């Protein structure tokens, strides 16, 4: 046996992790977990609880009631024992709210994207994905065994070229409606025009659109595209609805097909009833209190002005680009020390040289919280931008 081979055998099979961790630390890309307290001790401008519903009494009560009626867990795949009347009622109610014909719940937004993209593509088909699509869409494309073309960010002409030159009979264009790193909107109307020109399906991830755009119904609804026969919507229950889970919404045949073909649906345990009950209650609060989506956008605009961001936000998110990872990490830490928790995005989540703070607005922010945010952000960014 060669000496180099013997040395590799003698080493721990995980020895390589030490070098990887050193490289991450040197690049300012090391991550760690920070448990949040049960009672917040700082102002939250980092979570995705856009409508402020995760602690709403009605939402908590909805989860508790479902827990008492249906038990703690789904107990199995929805095809075995994990389906309940509650699941199907909420699917129908959410579909009606966003203007879709039908919906199918998954255990997370991530698995909803995996199930939808892989289930609607496969060998012999083409997937066209935006360069800044969410990681769940990226992974879904990789798992699909379809040919994948990644187009430049928000480049409709590149999507058109990919579809025009294809040999595959089936094609699916996938995009976020609201891109998570900077809160920008996808050119959804233009993408659908291109898809229709070439006979392709459009799949739109509304994770950051639901509850904020279109009066809470999402960007597709706002653009008058909800319920289109050649559009599929995915979204999560973990952001605006303050719960957990994911859903695919679209034509009724899509739901029927995914029940038979989506592996994350077939083989995963069904979504816990408490999560469904909480999300259902949150949807009812949103319907009863339609002021919440506009409040999110209004507060996002205030946060942008505090940070000197000229563009009016199109979503709950405000992106403050600082450049290198170390600058963003230091600024986020300084904000936290001063009582304001903000998001910190670094590569590979965002391109190199664009590490940033990401602030997320909530409908429930009050005047005192906004004033605290103004003081802290003004001081921290003055130092970070020197």
Curated annotation (Swiss-Prot):
EC category name: transferase
Keyword Nucleus (UniProt): no
Documented EC number(s): 2.3.1.47
PROSITE patterns reported for this sequence: AA_TRANSFER_CLASS_2
Pathway(s): Cofactor biosynthesis; biotin biosynthesis
Phenotype caused by lack of the gene: Cells lacking this gene are shown to be highly attenuated in a mouse tuberculosis model. Essential for growth even in liquid culture; growth does not occur on biotin-containing medium after biotin deprivation.
Molecular function terms from GO: 8-amino-7-oxononanoate synthase activity; pyridoxal phosphate binding
Superkingdom assignment: Bacteria
Residues holding pyridoxal 5'-phosphate: 109-110, 180, 205-208, 236-239
Activity regulation information from UniProt: Inhibited by D-alanine and D-7-keto-8-amino-pelargonic acid.
Reactions the enzyme catalyzes: 6-carboxyhexanoyl-[ACP] + L-alanine + H(+) = (8S)-8-amino-7-oxononanoate + holo-[ACP] + CO2
Keywords: Acyltransferase, Biotin biosynthesis, Pyridoxal phosphate, Transferase
Residues the record lists as binding substrate: 31, 134, 349
Assembly and interaction partners: Homodimer.
Stored PANTHER family: 8-AMINO-7-OXONONANOATE SYNTHASE, CLASS II AMINOTRANSFERASE/8-AMINO-7-OXONONANOATE SYNTHASE
Protein name: 8-amino-7-oxononanoate synthase 1
Organism of origin: Mycobacterium tuberculosis (strain ATCC 25618 / H37Rv)
Phylogenetic placement of the source organism: Bacteria, Bacillati, Actinomycetota, Actinomycetes, Mycobacteriales
Gene that encodes the chain: bioF1
